[in-house]
């Protein structure tokens, strides 16, 4: 028992609020670990309360697009969400910047009822270049981390406190294994104001202008072969429908042994006609088809650069790079949606789905650019226009 004098000295008061006292020797006997919980990152001292600057982001790890796993999986690690942190001002006490990173899994208690347990999560911090775009595989292959979570662990939330020199940093939150899905909340606390942004958030297209009519040039052997096949299928009207286009493409592509595919679908051919049908006839004449053929050859070479094993498939995780090479930059949300739409159960995209994806995207970009005459990034349409646009893409 504690005598009255000792109680007065330590100002102990009996109240029914869960507080209790024990001797230190008893404490050491019964406990081997103490966790001090602080509801905010503010100072625990009696000094003047300091407000921390807070940045907060919500995101997702989605199979086939942003569930890249930890650094052990270098081929997909770079596809994880990336966040830029610009620390300009050092702390008041020294020339370093105090940063607290907290990564929380969302909705896991609800998902546990469905048999899904907590994912094993962590994060890594890199010195960042000035580039504002989503960084690719080579950056992480040749650059080491500056800080990281102490371990990957299956907890609802993990947090670490770092002292970093002023500069630009890249923060990559991940699950340990690739292809594991979860929603997350990322909070970044800093003593001084810091600029933060999610990388790869740009939506834009750098597409060549449609070719202008020009005097016919002498056709090479490839074009002569295309014309013969085109005229054979088109008949007297010298134009082909979507079904006839399917015959032409499957006939031509089947001769190219480097392209392994099961055939171009009718839906893909409808999308091609919507993109290339300049005169709105619902069909393609030979000049329109020839322009498309030039596009298709470039898209085939692009696909083959990712289909390294010549299986007729490319990894859905590389869709960001493939579309960028084709002149189209998409943000993380859109890439996640495309992976869900076009990737198979092995997170691969076959040639026909790749072609459908790239044709529809270019068509949508061109339609939007034509409607956005003031170049403000905003268009207005009524319900009928929306329906017509949706049915023609």
Predicted ranges, named:
Residues 1-280, 286-291, 295-308, 320-326, ...:
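Accessory/interaction modules and long regulatory regions
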Residues 312-316, 321, 326-349:
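Extended, charged alpha-helical interaction scaffolds
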